[in-house]
């Protein structure tokens, strides 16, 4: 998938998608995953998201969001607090997924921020796929560490612009 996305060989099956119900389905599916037993999840979806329309490949976008949610649990020992927040303005859907775990290793953040990979490059395939999927939808993503600890993924996706995309 990553090679197909990188070279534009993965066709996007875009459909008009109501952001609110779509995001609730993604979060509900995560809650049914056995990994969810290792975290407490706080989900916040603002009213603006309910009327927002994405022109998106729902399966690929689901995969990206699942990767971030599952990574938060997989890469932290013990129970964590996980927060999923969605908001929208007139043009953009803003998603934030954050946890109170150990955060991203600096080597992971360095590679995600475009620094050359060294001989002992970290494993970032899941987060790289997230970047590619969000970018393929015309969006952007940023991964950072929280102070004093924890990880945060911030994603922005364009909303459908006109009736032809809705």
Residue ranges and their predicted role:
Residues 7-12, 53-56:
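Conserved micro-motifs of the catalytic ATP-binding
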Residues 8, 33-45:
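Short conserved segments within the C-terminal catalytic ATPase subdomain
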Residues 13-28:
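A conserved beta-strand-to-alpha-helix junction within the catalytic ATP-binding
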Residues 71-73:
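Short helix-loop "hinge" at the ATP-lid/N-box region of the Bergerat-fold HATPase_c
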Residues 79-91:
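Short beta-strand/loop element within the Bergerat-fold HATPase_c
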Residues 126, 130:
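Short alpha-helical Gxxx[C/S/T] motif in the catalytic ATP-binding
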């Amino acid at each position: 998938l990553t090679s197909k996305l990188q070279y534009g060989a993965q066709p996007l099956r875009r459909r008009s998608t109501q952001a609110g119900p779509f995001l609730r389905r993604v979060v509900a599916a995560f809650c049914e995953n056995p990994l969810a037993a290792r975290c407490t999840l706080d989900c916040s979806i603002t009213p603006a998201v309910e009327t927002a329309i994405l022109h998106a490949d729902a399966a690929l976008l689901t995969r990206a969001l699942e990767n971030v949610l599952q990574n938060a649990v997989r890469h932290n020992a013990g129970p964590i607090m996980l927060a999923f927040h969605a908001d929208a303005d007139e043009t953009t859907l803003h998603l934030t997924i954050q946890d109170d775990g150990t955060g991203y290793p600096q080597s992971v953040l360095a590679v995600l921020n475009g620094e050359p990979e060294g001989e002992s490059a970290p494993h970032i395939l899941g987060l790289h796929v997230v970047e590619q999927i969000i970018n393929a939808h015309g969006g952007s993503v940023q991964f950072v560490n929280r102070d004093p600890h924890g990880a945060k993924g911030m994603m922005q996706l364009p909303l459908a612009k006109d009736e032809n995309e809705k």
